């Protein structure tokens, strides 16, 4: 009896039917069938490895994703640091402008520092 396991069961059954149709000797038909199935299995492994290699080259790996994540985090941190510096400079300028344009602020600063 011939085993037709897995997803390829229908294709293997059809293959055996075609072989049996042209080769009337059942033993020889089964030998040819087994040889063809063996070739299919060997080629399947080769194709599987080729496909795996091709997909590995085309798709992002976990390492690629981690590198991209690291670059994005560094970029965001850099932008936050730049923004923080700009905000600090802006506040210093704002305070200086307030002090320079407000006579009451100058008096308050003199009072706070004990300058008369």
From Swiss-Prot:
> In which domain of life is the source organism classified?
Archaea
- What GO cellular-component annotations does this UniProt entry give? membrane
How does this protein lie in the membrane?
A: Single-pass membrane protein
| Sequence intervals crossing the membrane | 89-109
Where is the protein localized? Membrane
Main localization category: membrane
* Alphabetically ordered keywords of this record: Membrane, Transmembrane, Transmembrane helix
In the record, the note on similarity to other proteins reads: Belongs to the M.jannaschii MJ0023/MJ0349/MJ1072/MJ1074/MJ1107/MJECL16 family.
Q: What is this protein called?
A: Uncharacterized protein MJ1072
